[in-house]
Amino acid sequence: MKAIMVVGTTSHAGKSFLTTALCRILARRGWHVTPFKGQNMALNSYVTPTGGEMGFAQAVQAWAAGTAPRVEMNPILLKPQGNMTSQVILMGKVAGQTTASDYYEQYFKPGWEAIASALKRLAFEYDLVICEGAGSPAEINLKHRDLTNMRVAQHLGATTLLVVDIDRGGAFAHVVGTLALLDPEERALIKGIIINKFRGQRSLLDSGIKWLEDYTGIPVLGVIPWSEILFPAEDSLDLFERKTKPNGEININVIRLPRISNFTDFDALESEPTVSLNYLDLSQELGYPDAVIIPGSKTTIQDLSALHTSGMAEKLEQYANAGGIVLGICGGFQMLGRRVLDPNQIEGKQEEFAGLNLLPIETTILPDKITTQRQVFSNHPQSGLPVTGYEIHQGITRLADGVKNLENVGCQALFNDEKLGIVTHSQLVWGCYLHGLFDNGAWRRAWLNFLRHRRGLSALPTGIPNYREQREATLNSVADLVEANVNLSPILSQL
């Protein structure tokens, strides 16, 4: 099987960005391409049509390659839960949870078997696999249990690219140090170096690039300039690089929970020209935005506890009582209820925790995870709009004790499936389980128009395409940027 591997000198060097770009570039050139990341640690995930869970970044890469996401593209997904533990997703299904110290003993062998098996299946269907590493391939203390960097490259005999982030400083030292720490047979696979996130005059790098090529014997294939393209973030650290649009007509705050997950839900909102989207730490003042969103969480109870102890829960209550709009998605939806129950102590030792008491619901955390794609129709803010998305949650939400039906407590079903979400009659508090909600263009605009009407602003057109079409334009822009600044000929000639 022909293969290209992308590894980085550090985390956030640009591996996902470059892998995605290569998928789109080579797909446009006629290759039948698949992305692959053997092991990913991330809280942004996606559900395949068969109900398997995988990293959202690999789903984006699949779309870039013009193919459907499938769990073989990311056979191991680690979802941090706090307290140095992670949930292990193996071939799309929950396999258990583990600590960093126990992971190697428990999952190294089955993990590698899953990786090798997934690659074998993909080899039957695709011309080329473009693999992404994780972190650095030269972490000496972790190398013996590294499942996703040079072990994969050696298994495939992959033509390997080393990408470095020059914006953080020390790029030349990062490259030289990484290469020095690789084994000779690993280093021999590195066929090109790519410098990423460069700001400034390109010619100023020329002398450094010549020295680097002479010293390492490896060509620098390109310098990718810093870009403001809104590329889907892989983990919450990427949120610090996001810039809030100033002077938006509509201001929306997203609570940056300690264990925030699936914040790719808000890329579509961030793409709206009239919206200023701000990620708010728990220590910051809530202010008086047009809406506040409580996003998904990997551990609902721990993040709910953080809302209470930080004082943010009280601020949210005051904001809602003053007529503010609050929307919760997935874990955020669960937090809006009266209480969260954990009888099996899945998230911790506390079996019951008080919610924000903004919706008449309660949630019970259960061992089995629900992962499924959904197609429904909206009741609010406009009825009859088709809405697609996906569920990823460990818990069942129902009406609170003593509540017989929604109408009795001033609420309505948000969709034609009541279990997916509810909204108060006042339309001040919204909650739903549907990830990808804002990707639905007509629904997103209808909700924004509801906010705009409250501000006395004119309505925006609702007859717009879904965000997946905007994502396609983004993927083409990413590919165009890389194609214009990286010489791929030496790499492709070796395939």
Curated annotation (Swiss-Prot):
Pfam families for the chain: CbiA, GATase_3
Gene Ontology biological process terms from the UniProt entry: cobalamin biosynthetic process
Annotated GO MF terms: ABC-type vitamin B12 transporter activity; catalytic activity
Functional pathway: Cofactor biosynthesis; adenosylcobalamin biosynthesis
Positions of the catalytic residues: C330, H435
Top-level taxonomic group: Bacteria
PROSITE patterns reported for this sequence: GATASE_COBBQ
Keyword Secreted: no
Keywords: Cobalamin biosynthesis, Glutamine amidotransferase
Presence of the UniProt keyword Secreted in the record: no
CDD domains tied to this protein: CobQ_N, GATase1_CobQ
Residue ranges crossing the lipid bilayer per the database entry: none
Boundaries of every GATase cobBQ-type domain copy: 249-443
Similarity comment text for this entry: Belongs to the CobB/CobQ family. CobQ subfamily.
Function: Catalyzes amidations at positions B, D, E, and G on adenosylcobyrinic A,C-diamide. NH(2) groups are provided by glutamine, and one molecule of ATP is hydrogenolyzed for each amidation.
Database matches in NCBIfam families: cobQ, PRK00784.1
Protein name: Cobyric acid synthase
Organism: Gloeothece citriformis (strain PCC 7424) (Cyanothece sp. (strain PCC 7424))
The encoding gene: cobQ
